[in-house]
Every structure is written in structure tokens, then in C-alpha cells.
């Protein structure tokens, strides 16, 4: 891994940490965070699967000791399953975005949507277990109120990825042959 790639990953991790802390109140008990928005942009501009896994993994570990999760939370909370899923969704996102035979914008939307559903699944299961709720109740609390906001986030990410210059989205020439 060269200096440019390490620096890019460090900047993206810092961006995730900073944007992930803030949660915008949208009503009673509904706070919309920017974690997924930032994560999907990170996934769209990191070329290597390793980087897509590394950044959310470091975010997960840092959040165990520092208040960088949504709403300045720290440690294992009822929503920790969503943070765990950030590491897991890197894999399907990577393969869907890189290898589906469609235009880039459609690959990106599909990768984000599938990843979002996996995130919902892991996060709501973790919440149900953590709070000793039924899966249905956890789904109603942790997923349903956020679906519209997450669709908007995917739309924003798609526009952002489309507008970013290719130089930001690609690996340095010397690393493009690596997987």
C-alpha cells in the first residue's frame, strides 16, 4: 500500500468519523445520521475491497473507545448491529459495483440498495437480541422510520459519485493491477 492510498483511506476514515457523529432530529425519536451516506460515497470511491473493509472496520473499533457513532455515542448500543453491518456490506457492495454488466450509475444504485437491505437485516436483528424485542418490533423501531431518508441518501450519493472526478475514484496507476 503506497502513501497516497494510505492517506486517502485516513481522510475517508476521518470523514466517516466526523459525519457519523451528527444525527439530525426529524421527529419524535427519529434521528437521521450521515453514516450511510458517507459510507456509500466511500465505497464508491475506494477501488479495492480491502479498503472498503478496512475503513468501516477501523470506524467500528474507534467507536468502541471514542464517541464517534451517531449522536456522539460510544461502545455497544442497541444500534451497534448497524455499525457491524458496515463492515459486512463492503463485500456485496464491492462485487455488485465492480462486476454487474450495467452502466456505472445503475451498478452503484443496485450496490447501495442491496447493501442497505443487508444493513437493515443485521442492524434490526442485533437490536432485537440486544433489547430482547421481537424482530418485528425492532424492524418498526430501527428500519421503517428511516427508509425514506435512506432512499434520499442513496440518491444524494449517486449524484455525488457521478460528479466526483475519476482521479478521486481510482487507485494510483501502480496499484490498478492489484485486487
Language-model-detected regions and their locations in the chain:
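Membrane-embedded alpha-helical hairpins and interfacial helices in multi-pass inner-membrane proteins
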Residues: 28, 72, 104-177
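Interfacial aromatic-anchored transmembrane helix boundaries in multi-pass membrane proteins
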Residues: 20-31, 59-91
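Structural signal for the C-terminal ends of transmembrane alpha-helices
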Residues: 44-49, 92-100, 163-168
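Structural signal for membrane-spanning alpha-helices in multi-pass inner-membrane proteins
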Residues: 16, 20, 42-43, 63-70, ...
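Alpha-helical transmembrane segments of multi-pass membrane proteins
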Residues: 16, 44, 59-63, 86, ...
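Hydrophobic alpha-helical transmembrane segments
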Residues: 6-11, 37-41, 52-57, 79-84, ...
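Mid-bilayer segments of alpha-helical transmembrane spans in multi-pass integral membrane proteins
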Residues: 79, 83, 87, 91, ...
